[in-house]
Structures are given as structure tokens and as C-alpha cells.
Amino acid sequence: MKFKFLNMDNESGFILIEKELKRLKITAQVKEDGIELKGENIKQARIYLQTLFNSNIMELDDHQKSANALIERLKSLDLKIAVAESCSGGLLSHAFTSISGASAVFMGGVVCYSEEVKRELLKVNATTLKVFGVYSEECVKEMLLGVFLNFKVGLALAISGVAGPNGGSKANPVGTIYIGVQRLGSQALIDRCFFEGNRESIQNKSVEHALNMLARML
């Protein structure tokens, strides 16, 4: 089981649960991006954590659990979100819409697979695409702004990159993914990631990282 705290940093949260984890004979590896638990009593540990922290923890083992925790967190903060995604092809939207009740916070998404859709619907500047390309921090920043233009939301997520197996370049080889999150009125947070694996694996890892970035912003 891997999870992270949404209302505090992982190191501080671990101090609160360390004694109980030892009692359950659970070993823990604490990192900035999450806490990984191992042991025979993971089921009991999960129940303990959910009882104690409710929606203030997010499991990172699968998209559905991550999205469910984020939806509850967004509800508590009275925030709505929409997305723009290219190489993930709708998987980011699906991570939210697979959860019953997501419509309370998830307003919709744009699968902007072509440059034309990025330009026409999201208003990504043609010069940005020509100078920096679709696989760039600059493109993702403008995709985020395009989300705010199309949806009445307080949060935006965007993904663009090379999922492979074809495509890519020396500057942006297959597996290079740019992921951005932005709160309305605040500066965008953009990560340049490199994921290994086949196309499906890279797409899934992109969605997982996007959900992680959203959790970090919240």
C-alpha cells in the first residue's frame, strides 16, 4: 500500500501513525511523494488510516482510489476542476468520471490530440507551437489557460507528451511527458517527466503523476 497525506507533509503524518504501524508489524518507507507500507497486516493498516484520517489521505496504488480521495478533498474545499489532455487520450478524465458523484467537482475535459484542437479550442498560440512544440512546458501552460477559458472552474490539469512507441526526438524522446496543474489566479506548476514502458504504461503513469500533482497543490 502506498499513500500520501493531503492535509500535512508525509513526515509529519508518519509521526502520528508510527506507533500503530509498529504494533501491526508494518514496515514503512517515507518519501516526499508518499509513504509505502509493507507487511501481512496491510488490510488492518488501511482500515486504521481511513478511520483516523478519512478523506485526508490518498492511496496511490491505483487511479480510482486516488481520484476518489481527490474528489472528496475538492468537495471539502468547494473547488471544481476540468482537464485538457493529449497523449493520455481521455484517461485523466476517466479517472474522475469512474467515481460516482464526481460531477459535483469534475466539470469536464478536452482531448486535444491534434495541434488544430489545441489552437482552435484551447487557444494555444500558433507561435508557441511553432517555436516550442506540443511537447513543451510552454504548450502545457497555455493548455491550462485554455481550460479556464472553456470551463468555470478553480483548478485545471493538463497533459502533453510522447507516449510512443513512435514519435519523439532527441530533445523529447518517447516517455517524455509534460504535466501541469494550476489554481485560478495562481502560477502554474509544470513537471517534465520521463516514464519507461509501453504506450499504455506511459499513459497510466502520466495520469498517476497528474493526480499526484493535484494532491500536492491541494
Regions found by a protein language model. Give the residues of each.
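Short Gly/Ser/Thr- and Asp/Glu-enriched loop/turn motifs at secondary-structure junctions
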Residues: 30-34
